[in-house]
A protein has these predicted regions:
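DNA/chromatin major-groove-contacting recognition/catalytic segments
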Residues: 109, 178-182, 232-238, 338-357
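N-terminal core-binding DNA-recognition domain of tyrosine site-specific recombinases/integrases
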Residues: 67-156, 165, 187, 276-280, ...
């Protein structure tokens, strides 16, 4: 591989031709290398990447992985994935050849990562460690599926951390009514929490709502988007899942409340966000209401659990509840099984009748 010295500034550069994925010949020029060896190494790595050679560096393969995967993901999903790759994975493996990383290397990496702590000094949770390992494993799986790598060393090494069941907190109707009574003098937060509790929608779905999503004649609320704050910008995305696209029937009192709220909003356009709040503002409002009312502290997302709990207590099926909140019925059954009344005794009694006892 030839490298050339720039007579003007003394640095090195490479210039070469290669065949791209369309089969067309392309020319590449790269300047600014301090040494001839660095210039040649860059050319070699570039060509291995273009040829999908698994002897390329891990860092080069991650660039391919980003090119392949990023367009398929929502921006917030990719940013979460990219942060882990950049801070927890690349610093350890970037200079290694993709094909030479072993399960032993992954175990050594796991042991190193386990020693890391948050800025507060706390250890990382088992959930987070599992997620970090999963991101590494995803990279190797991608290399196996599309680039000819034979073995996933991360899978062979075994997982790091474990998925912990998250504690499910929720308010009873009585607790919620105490809380919302304390929010009466904060109109925007009051109506936001009313929608969250009585409709069971997600936080991002709430913050993306516009007047066009409400049909007061039919008393319905349309959910077809979600709000995120990403890289300092407000971003409206599609909802979390396909099932999340839904139309929710609102109770009469909530319809009346929202019409009253709209009258308070000056210059409201059909596509304006009706709750121009941040997630932090909602969280702060929740903390205020909990303290003022004396009810137990729960997360914003737990209002969704509270809505599901209320519907279960009212006797609705997992299918009906799943359709309302945008979950599959099997997921509702799995997550909230402990809240559904048992029917085992009723089943046994009916089997007795069938047999003739």
């Amino acid at each position: 591989m030839a490298a050339f010295k720039d007579k003007k500034n003394g640095s090195w550069y490479v210039q070469f031709r290669y065949t791209d994925w369309r089969g067309e010949r392309q020319q590449k020029l790269k300047r600014g290398f301090a040494t001839k060896k660095e210039a040649q190494a860059w050319e070699r790595e570039f060509l291995m990447q273009k040829q999908a050679d698994i002897n390329m560096s891990f860092e080069s393969f991650v660039a391919l992985y980003e090119k392949d995967v990023k367009p398929k993901l929502k921006l917030n999903t990719w940013l979460s994935k990219e942060h882990i790759i950049r801070t927890k994975i690349l610093p350890y493996f970037k200079k290694r050849k993709l094909s030479e990383i072993t399960a032993r290397d992954v175990i050594d990496w796991q042991n190193e990562i386990r020693q890391h702590t948050k800025s507060s000094g706390e250890s990382y949770s088992p959930d987070y460690l599992k997620n970090v390992h999963t991101q590494l494993s995803c990279i190797f799986n991608h290399a196996i599926k599309y680039y000819g790598l034979q073995i996933n060393p991360a899978a062979k090494a075994g997982n790091m951390g474990s998925e912990q069941p998250k504690e499910m907190l929720f308010w009873t109707k009585e607790e919620y009514l105490k809380f919302i009574d304390a929010m009466m003098d904060k109109p925007m937060l009051y109506y936001a929490f009313e929608i969250l509790y009585w409709c069971g929608i997600r936080e991002g779905e709430l913050l993306a709502l516009t007047p066009a999503d409400f049909n007061f004649e039919k008393k319905t609320l349309r959910i077809n988007k979600s709000y995120q704050r990403l890289q300092g910008k407000d971003v409206i995305t599609t909802p979390k899942t396909k099932k999340s696209n839904r139309v929710i029937q609102m109770p009469d009192f909530l319809c009346d409340e929202m019409q009253d709220y709209f009258k308070q909003l000056y210059g409201l356009e059909p596509d304006s966000r009706i709750f121009p709040l941040s997630k932090y503002a909602l969280k702060r409002g929740m903390a205020f209401g909990c303290k003022a009312s004396g009810v137990k502290v729960i997360r914003i997302h737990d209002l969704r659990h509270s809505h599901v709990s209320l519907l279960i207590n009212m006797g609705y099926s997992a299918v009906a509840i799943g359709n309302r909140v945008g979950h599959e019925s099997v997921e509702i059954t799995y997550r909230y099984a402990h809240l559904f009344p048992t029917v085992q005794k009723e089943m046994a009694d009916k089997l007795n009748v069938e047999r003739g006892n």
